Design a protein with these regions (language model features):
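Extracytoplasmic ligand-binding site segments that recognize negatively charged/polar headgroups
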Residues: 1, 13-14, 18-21, 34-176
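A ligand-binding cleft/hinge motif common to bilobed small-molecule-binding domains
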Residues: 45-49, 173, 177-196
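Bilobed periplasmic-binding protein/Venus flytrap-like ligand-binding cleft at the lobe interface
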Residues: 106-114, 211-221
Length: 221
């Protein structure tokens, strides 16, 4: 928003930032009378459903031809455009783990080890896109039966569920928990700031998502 304000000083920007599930619910509630002009950095898994409802204004931004086709919806003009891709990851506090002689996890299954009981925090999949991404990935990798068995065991070790996908890594970085299930770029930023965390990508594989943007149909701005 700061960069936009500098390049467009005559435009007042009012923006609402929240978890994927919360924003998605708001978009659905306002679909017949949208309050927003632009939907920005929204999960493509949500955007494809919104596009089917016809709530976006088709628009191809300048330079769109330079983008990888994988970042586009394939329509001309486009209804949504991808910004970046991301994945899920574990944030492991090496200092707190050392105090408790806890081994670093290498896989998702490792998180069910009783040694981690109460020392894991993860995003709530009901409100967080990151949490939803993890659940979806586990089901895709293992099938529903095995995935839900895993999640039941994982739940026994989870000390807290957060509203957002970034908070678990922040909690792990602060030493509130040993392991925070989050995403890599939050972990990288915290690590660069000096947090004693290692970034772990699970051996079994990890879910990924793409953030996108679109213009709401009927916007006056």
């Amino acid at each position: 928003s700061e960069v936009f304000a500098k390049s467009h000083p005559n435009i007042k920007l009012n923006w609402i930032r929240d978890s994927t599930g919360i924003i998605a619910a708001r978009v659905l509630a306002e679909k017949d009378n949208p309050k927003a002009d632009v939907l920005f950095a929204m999960a493509v898994t949500s955007m494809t459903g919104f596009a089917k409802m016809g709530i976006f204004e088709p628009y191809s931004p300048k330079g769109i031809e330079k983008l990888n086709p994988l970042f586009l919806d394939g329509k001309k003009p486009a209804e949504w455009v991808g910004h970046y891709g991301w994945a899920s990851a574990m944030c492991f506090n090496t200092i707190e783990a050392g105090k408790r002689k806890m081994p670093p996890p290498a896989s998702w299954v490792d998180l069910t080890n009783p040694v981690y009981k109460g020392k894991i925090t993860m995003p709530n999949p009901a409100s967080s896109g990151t949490g939803y991404l993890m659940v979806a990935a586990w089901i895709q990798m293992w099938g529903e039966t095995k995935a839900w068995e895993f999640m039941d065991k994982l739940h026994e070790n989870v000390g807290a569920y957060s509203h957002s996908g970034s908070k678990p890594c922040e909690q792990a970085a602060a030493g509130e928990y040993v392991i925070g299930l989050s995403f890599p770029f939050r972990a990288i930023r915290l690590k660069e700031q000096g947090a004693p965390i290692d970034i772990v990508l699970a051996q079994e594989g990890t879910g990924w998502e793409m953030q996108t943007g679109a213009i709401m149909k009927g916007t006056k701005n």
